[in-house]
Amino acid sequence: HVSLVGSEMCIRDRNIITILDDMLETMYNANGIGLAATQIAIDKRLIVMDCGKTNFDPKDMSEEEYNEKIKNEGIEPFPIKMINPEIISFDKNLKEREEGCLSIPGYNANVKRPSSIKVTYTDENKKNKTLEANGLLATCIQHEIDHLNGILFIDHISKLKREIILKKAIKEYAKN
């Protein structure tokens, strides 16, 4: 259920690595860049994502230059697995970025979110980590943590846009 709220994950759980690996596989098979455990009916605070890794810093260029460089040089896989992620600080500047979701396939909307964040989490090796993220990765982390809190990306857009998307999605779902 997509609006399930995830509960704190016990780090001693032996199944954790299997769950995280299965989540990554599910995400890759769906051509997604992020997945929260709550999206696949696991009420734990687990997220996985892969926004790719580049050999250049996107902060040094415009979004157009960045997209052109990606097209020319490609992106290496860079999976990230987070247990009990928590955003501890964020930039006051909001950036609008188009978002989609595996829970509402085929529908996108522009969402404003902090352009950079700092997140603490435990990795699959039970190491506590802090990550500073910006750009697409920051958006993806916020989107997935929202899922853990029962929030969808459409909850961040106007009521009218949300209703239009939901009506279309329900109509599409009813056809199948």
Segments (PLM) and residue ranges:
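Helix-adjacent hinge/juxtasegments
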Residues: 45-97
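Flexible, small-/acidic-enriched active-site or ligand-binding loops
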Residues: 98, 102-112
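Short polybasic amphipathic segments
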Residues: 117-122
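Short pre-active-site segment immediately N-terminal to the catalytic Zn-binding motif
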Residues: 123-139
